[in-house]
């Protein structure tokens, strides 16, 4: 029996290539001898990572270990998340980001994109949206020295290059100070909820209205606002019980995603794409908008 238990993880080894783990929302290491192996990677390290990622019952073992620590010690031992104060959950905190060459190169790329757009009479706007820790830094666990000074340095570089940009951080901090929950305490630990998105997107629309007066901010009455019960953390099987605000548009949208899906070249790991038409806004003369977004 012991031998059977010992060999079962090997018997259920995960051989599938290019698979994303549901427990920690990342792509598992591919076979270092296969066609999808990372070029130039250290073979020993790749083999070790491959076995650790693909061993049978990996997700179940991680979940069991996480739940045991939560119930016994109220500690979240999880690849993605950690507890803060007062019941808050955050993405696992890493070392503070240091402003460097990458950010300078990224700012210069944005300036080039803006120049490309403006040469074709197309307005350009870069939007920076804050992570949860930037709006609720006081809810991080003790011992965390949260420093996002790189953001100010990055925005200073954007100003030097003349990039048209807005930052929604202060807006959401002000909304929080006014008593509104613009990020959930637990669910979706890094991203704003629909209420936060409502305010952030309106700030974007107000900025764009300077180019196109026909663009108007949304109103709460434009949406059916309900609550959705979330029973696990996002991209995880960790159990929770939290309601989040859900905004559904009352105006029916035309969805053309499938019609154009094959025409849009995308990275294999980032396949997100959507094409939506709001007939009411089209009738009001609103322009088409192309949005590139990160997390």
Q: Positions of the model-derived regions?
A:
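Extracellular glycan-modifying ectodomains
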Residues: 1-295
């Amino acid at each position: 029996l012991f031998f059977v238990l010992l060999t079962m993880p090997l018997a259920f080894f995960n051989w599938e290539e290019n698979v994303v783990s549901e427990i920690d929302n990342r792509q598992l290491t591919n076979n270092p001898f296969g066609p999808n192996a990372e070029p130039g990677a250290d073979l020993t390290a790749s083999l070790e990572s491959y076995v650790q990622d693909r061993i049978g019952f990996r997700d179940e073992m991680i979940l069991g270990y996480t739940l045991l620590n939560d119930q016994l010690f109220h500690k979240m031992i999880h690849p993605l998340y950690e507890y803060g104060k007062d019941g808050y959950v955050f993405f696992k905190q890493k070392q503070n980001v240091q402003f460097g060459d990458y950010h300078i190169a990224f700012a210069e790329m944005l300036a080039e994109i803006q120049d490309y757009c403006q040469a074709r009479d197309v307005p350009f706007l870069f939007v920076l949206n804050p992570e949860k820790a930037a709006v609720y830094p006081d809810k991080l666990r003790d011992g965390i020295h949260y420093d996002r000074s790189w953001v100010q340095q990055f925005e200073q570089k954007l100003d030097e290059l003349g990039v048209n940009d807005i930052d929604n951080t202060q807006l959401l901090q002000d909304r929080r100070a006014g008593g509104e929950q613009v990020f959930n305490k637990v669910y979706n630990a890094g991203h704003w909820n629909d209420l936060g998105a409502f305010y952030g997107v309106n700030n974007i629309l107000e900025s764009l209205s300077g180019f196109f007066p026909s663009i108007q901010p949304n109103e709460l009455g434009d949406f059916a606002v309900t609550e959705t019960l979330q029973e696990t953390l996002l991209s995880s099987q960790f159990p929770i019980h939290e309601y989040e605000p859900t905004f559904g548009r009352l105006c029916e949208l035309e969805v053309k995603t499938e019609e154009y899906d094959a025409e849009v070249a995308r990275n294999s790991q980032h396949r997100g794409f959507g094409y939506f038409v709001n007939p009411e806004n089209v009738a009001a003369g609103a322009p088409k908008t192309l949005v590139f977004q990160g997390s």
